[in-house]
């Protein structure tokens, strides 16, 4: 059965854990018929408390059972040449791409006492430089060849303070600014550019204490789930989302 994204190729970065937002995005796009090329970086992901070591193969099998092609490759997005390398591999495998989802991020707690140039550079490389260069190279290779979608994951750094995350918030804010202006730059090529802020999302790493603290701040009475932003991203990736561009969309369940 033909679906909204049948035959299209989506590239999603930052996909490692089966319960993560990246995996939820991949599942939702696959349900709509998109073939998938996924990346993750075990060197960073496996250090996280909710790491998903060894789950990539299971996720690929799950996606393939939905009737789409799916590939995964490790990729260190902190490398300056990573965007070009990724698009070379994608073109060799699928020849074309229609959707880019910049989901990968780098986050380490910091403070006035610990913030330094190295920490800023590490955040900038993954949270700002990589998605910008991935997006620019995507447009260079596939722009003007029909509808294309660029969707980036962001956070609520422009809505209020996020203490202990100085490097993270400033580098994510740069991606927000890029989204707004890049949408205007490439609209004439049939490309939409948007960002999604999912708010606090329980993807398996929240402690019970954190869950209790956050719950009362959601107007809709529950914590965010990985599937919530995935639904919105599938809409933005599809034909119905073609009139939305240059926007940072807040899909936060009324969180404040």
Name these PLM-found stretches.
Residues 135, 171:
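Active-site helix of classical SDR
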Residues 187, 192, 244-246:
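Short, small/polar-rich loop/turn modules that mediate ligand/substrate recognition or access, typified
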Residues 159-160, 212-217, 234, 245-256:
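Short C-terminal tail/terminal secondary-structure segment
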Residues 218-229, 240:
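A conserved structural motif in NAD(P)-dependent oxidoreductases
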Residues 140, 180, 184-185, 242:
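Alpha-helical segment proximal to the catalytic Tyr-Lys
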Residues 111-112, 119-121, 206, 214:
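Substrate-binding pocket helix/loop in short-chain dehydrogenase/reductase
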Residues 3-41:
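Canonical Rossmann dinucleotide-binding motif of NAD(H)/NADP(H)-dependent dehydrogenases/reductases
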Residues 98, 106, 113-132, 151, ...:
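Catalytic Tyr-X3-Lys loop
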């Amino acid at each position: 059965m033909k679906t909204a994204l049948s035959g299209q190729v989506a590239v999603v970065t930052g996909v490692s854990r089966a319960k993560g937002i990246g995996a939820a995005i991949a599942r939702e796009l696959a349900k709509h018929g998109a073939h998938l090329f996924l990346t993750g970086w075990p060197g960073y992901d496996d250090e996280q408390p909710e790491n998903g070591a060894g789950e990539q193969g299971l996720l690929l099998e799950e996606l393939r059972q939905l009737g789409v092609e799916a590939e995964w490759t490790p990729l260190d997005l902190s490398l300056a040449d990573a965007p070009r390398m990724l698009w070379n591999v994608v073109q060799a495998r699928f020849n074309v791409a229609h959707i880019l989802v910049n989901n990968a991020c780098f986050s380490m707690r910091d403070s006035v006492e610990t913030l330094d140039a190295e920490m800023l550079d590490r955040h900038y490389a993954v949270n700002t430089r990589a998605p910008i260069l991935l997006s620019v190279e995507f447009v260079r290779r596939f722009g003007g060849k029909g509808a294309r979608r660029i969707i980036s994951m962001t956070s609520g750094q422009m809505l209020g303070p996020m203490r202990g995350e100085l490097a993270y918030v400033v580098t994510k804010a740069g991606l927000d600014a890029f989204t707004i202006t890049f949408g205007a730059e490439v609209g004439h090529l049939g490309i939409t550019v948007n960002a999604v802020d999912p708010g606090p999302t329980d993807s398996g790493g929240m402690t019970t204490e954190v869950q209790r603290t956050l719950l009362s701040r959601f107007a809709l009475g529950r914590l965010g789930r990985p599937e919530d932003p995935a639904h919105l991203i599938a809409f933005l990736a599809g034909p119905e989302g073609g009139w939305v561009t240059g926007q940072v969309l807040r899909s936060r369940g009324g969180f404040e």
